[in-house]
Every structure is written in C-alpha cells, then in structure tokens.
A protein has these predicted regions:
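N-terminal secretory signal peptides that target proteins for export/translocation
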Residues: 1-16
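Boundary at the C-terminal end of the N-terminal hydrophobic targeting segment
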Residues: 34-40
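Structural alpha/beta surface segment adjacent to cysteine/selenocysteine redox centers
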Residues: 66, 71, 77-152
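Short, flexible loop segments at the rims of nucleotide/cofactor-binding pockets, characterized by
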Residues: 43-44, 72, 169-170
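Bacterial N-terminal signal peptides
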Residues: 19-32
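C-terminal cap of thioredoxin/glutaredoxin-like
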Residues: 5-7, 39, 150-227
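Extracellular/periplasmic catalytic domains that process cell-envelope and extracellular macromolecules
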Residues: 57-60, 87-89, 106, 183-188
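A short beta-strand-turn-helix
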Residues: 44-63
Length: 227
C-alpha cells in the first residue's frame, strides 16, 4: 500500500472507511477517548467568570458564540457540528479560542497548525479544525497528527513548510488564548457562551446544556432587538 493510500485509510472523515482492522482500531481508541472525556464533564452550575472582557461579540456583530476548546477533547469534537450549525442558522460569528489542556500531547500543535492554515485563508484554517475534530479518534499521537496535516495540506494543494512556526509567533498566540481562558476562569473544555452587545439581557450566558443552545441564541437575539 502506498504512503498516501495508507493515510487515506487512517483518516476516515477524509476517505471512506475500509477494512475490519480499522473498525477494531477505532473501537479501541474510542474506549480510550471515552475514558479521557470523563475528565472534561462541565459542572452543572457553569463557570465562575473572573474576567468577562473577552465575552463579547466581535466588532459589527450583536450576538456571537464564543468557545474555548481543545483538539483532543472528545466532547469538543461532539460539540463542533452543533456550534457550526447554530452559527450558520443564525448567521452569527463562532469565535473559537484555543485552550489546549496540559495532559494532551498534540492539541497544542494542532492549534498552531490551524493558525498557520489561517494565514492561507480563514476558511482553510476552519476546515482544518473541523477535520481534526472529525478524525480525532484516529489521531492518537503527534506523529499521526503530522501525517494527517501533511495529507490535509496536499489535498488542499497547499505547500506545507518543514516548520510552520519557526519564530514561535503562532505558538505565542495559542498561549495567549490559554492565558485568556485562565483569566476568565475556564476549568473544562469545551466552554461555550452565547454573548451579546447592546442588550437589555445578560451580556453573556454559558451554554451548560447544549440542547438549549438554540433557545439561548433566540433569547439573545430577542434581547438585542428589544433595545
């Protein structure tokens, strides 16, 4: 099997899943991921916010979704399609912040890679993020992440340099996001808020129960319209 074909089999969200071995490997990795996910169950009471300065929509928006996520967090991968659906449905920004947890061995690098793809186009960077989440169960080491990233770049006709961040600028941006999350008071991933500007209601509401995400957005939009 050629190197490129082997990579295609390894990342099922990029290519059709084939072979019994892949199913068995996925089942084993799912068990590991499920165990890891238990570390990140959000508290029912939500986050005690210490610094709310970042919990506001970007310029020009009245309502937005703000998320702090880790690329190895299984619950972040589960939340991603819903957040994208909500942002598209309501035509509001999805503001993603990196919060790579210290116990994970490749999430920081994935965050740096995503920011490098952002330098080519924001759409490409977001597509990389989405594909990392979609293939998360197959990316079980830094070496596999590197192979995944090489294939993603090749599939999108982008020349991937030997070092994507030789000066450490992108890594510094990821660290700044993590420090911001610490200042806010984040203790788990994903942490998600619906935030508003010029609203008579709460300026930000944490989405503790994701089944209520659309309801919270509806309320935020109604609050901004009533002013």
């Amino acid at each position: 099997m050629s190197h490129s074909l082997a990579l295609a089999h390894r990342f099922p969200a990029l290519r059709p899943r084939t072979g019994l071995w892949l199913g068995l490997a996925a089942a084993a990795l799912l068990a590991v991921a499920a165990a890891a996910q238990a570390q990140f169950v959000p508290p029912e009471t939500g986050t005690q916010v210490h610094d709310a300065s970042a919990l506001k929509p970007p310029a020009g928006a009245r309502v937005a979704i703000v998320e702090f996520a880790d690329y190895e967090c299984p619950d972040c991968a589960r939340a991603n399609p819903l957040l994208k659906e909500a942002a598209a449905k309501y035509k509001i920004p999805l503001v993603r912040h990196d919060f790579p947890l210290p116990m994970h061995n490749w999430s920081f690098t994935a965050a740096v890679n995503a920011r490098w793809f952002d330098t080519k186009s924001k759409a490409l960077g977001d597509e990389y993020r989405d594909q990392v989440f979609a293939n998360q169960i197959s990316i079980y080491s830094p070496a596999i992440l590197a192979q995944f990233t090489e294939k993603f770049a090749a599939d999108h006709h982008v020349a991937l340099p030997f070092a994507v961040d030789p000066q450490g600028k992108l890594a510094a941006e990821v660290k700044a996001d993590y420090a911001l999350g610490q200042r806010i008071g984040i203790e788990h991933t994903p942490t998600i808020w619906v935030v508003t500007a010029n609203s008579k209601g709460a300026p930000f509401v944490e989405v503790v129960d994701r089944s209520k995400l659309f309801q919270l957005i509806d309320q935020a939009i109604a609050d901004t319209r009533s002013r």
